[in-house]
Amino acid sequence: MSRHYEIVFMVHPDQSEQVPAMIERYKSLVENGNGTIHRLEDWGRRQLAYPIQNLVKAHYVLLNIEADQAVLNELTESFRFNDAVLRNLVIKRDEADTEQSLIMKSKDEKGDKPERGERRRRDDEEGETTPAADNDAGDDAASAA
């Protein structure tokens, strides 16, 4: 009997380049077991709430699947034996979630907003334009004299 599950797993940030291959492996595991994937989201590297193995960031992946218990057991076992997977969470759902998650919606809304460090540099640059304009005026006055 197939049930709906929501799965989130976190991958070691040094293994981020292997995440697409891991996703493909887990997708094929579900599909070969006659399961279906209703939603798959790669959230990328995100800040952890607390350090895990002295790490402050991890690569997050969300899966919403419909599969039977044997497939789920195989999936959780593969998480357990994969050293790159830091944590995983499996939640049984009443129905399939196919709409975009809140995290992905907030990423889309931010869209082209600069990263935190970039924003700070831009603010610094904007703050410098006013004194720079004063200096230019002063330079013009000095060159005229």
From Swiss-Prot:
Question: In the record, what terms sit under GO molecular function?
Answer: small ribosomal subunit rRNA binding; structural constituent of ribosome
Top-level division of the source organism's lineage = Bacteria
InterPro entries, per the entry: Ribosomal_bS6 (IPR000529), Ribosomal_bS6_sf (IPR035980), Ribosomal_S6_plastid/chlpt (IPR020814), Transl_elong_EF1B/ribsomal_bS6 (IPR014717)
Xref: SUPFAM superfamilies: Ribosomal protein S6
Question: What UniProt keywords apply to this chain's record, in alphabetical order?
Answer: Ribonucleoprotein, Ribosomal protein, RNA-binding, rRNA-binding
Q: Which Pfam families match?
A: Ribosomal_S6
Q: Where are the transmembrane segments?
A: none
Region entry Disordered, spans: 97-145
Its Gene Ontology biological processes?
A: translation
Skewed-composition ranges (Basic and acidic residues): 105-124
GO cellular component terms listed in the entry, alphabetical order = cytosolic small ribosomal subunit
Q: Does the keyword Repeat apply?
A: no
Q: Which Gene3D superfamilies match?
A: 3.30.70.60
Regions of compositional bias (Low complexity) in chain numbering: 132-145
Q: Does the keyword RNA-binding apply?
A: yes
Q: Which CDD domains match?
A: bS6 (cd00473)
Family membership: Belongs to the bacterial ribosomal protein bS6 family.
HAMAP family assigned to the protein according to its UniProt record, in alphabetical order: Ribosomal_bS6
What this protein is reported to do is described as: Binds together with bS18 to 16S ribosomal RNA.
| Name of the protein this chain belongs to | Small ribosomal subunit protein bS6
What is the protein's species of origin?
Stenotrophomonas maltophilia (strain R551-3)
